[in-house]
Amino acid sequence: MCTTLFLLSTLAMLWRRRFANRVQPEPSGADGAVVGSRSERDLQSSGRKEEPLK
């Protein structure tokens, strides 16, 4: 009984490791250029630094 439980838990862990780490590629632009992530574009487009709240 314990051996079966150990075997099933090991298989479940290996199965999750194999299939849980799928990374979806971001859609590129129409001209094939690589587009940065949304947070990078937001930081570049703002051009100013945030002032700390007092």
From Swiss-Prot:
GO CC annotations on file: cytoplasm; endoplasmic reticulum; extracellular region; Golgi apparatus; photoreceptor outer segment membrane
Tissue expression remark: Expressed in retina.
Superkingdom in the source lineage: Eukaryota
Listed GO biological process terms: visual perception
Gene Ontology molecular function, alphabetical: opsin binding
Post-translational modification comment from the UniProt entry: Palmitoylated at Cys-2. Palmitoylation is essential for protein stability and trafficking to the photoreceptor outer segment, but does not appear to be essential for membrane localization. Probably palmitoylated by ZDHHC3.
Bias type Basic and acidic residues, positions: 38-54
Lipidation (S-palmitoyl cysteine): 2
Leader sequence residues: none
Pfam families for this protein: Rod_cone_degen
Paired cysteines (S-S): none
Main localization category: other
Region of interest: Disordered: 24-54
Keywords in alphabetical order: Cell projection, Disease variant, Endoplasmic reticulum, Golgi apparatus, Lipoprotein, Membrane, Palmitate, Retinitis pigmentosa, Sensory transduction, Vision
Membrane topology: Lipid-anchor
Disease: Defects in PRCD are the cause of progressive rod-cone degeneration (PRCD). PRCD is the most widespread hereditary retinal disease leading to blindness in dogs and phenotypically is the canine counterpart of retinitis pigmentosa in humans.
Subunit structure: Interacts with RHO/rhodopsin; the interaction promotes PRCD stability.
Protein name: Photoreceptor disk component PRCD
Organism name: Canis lupus familiaris
Phylogenetic lineage: Eukaryota, Metazoa, Chordata, Craniata, Vertebrata
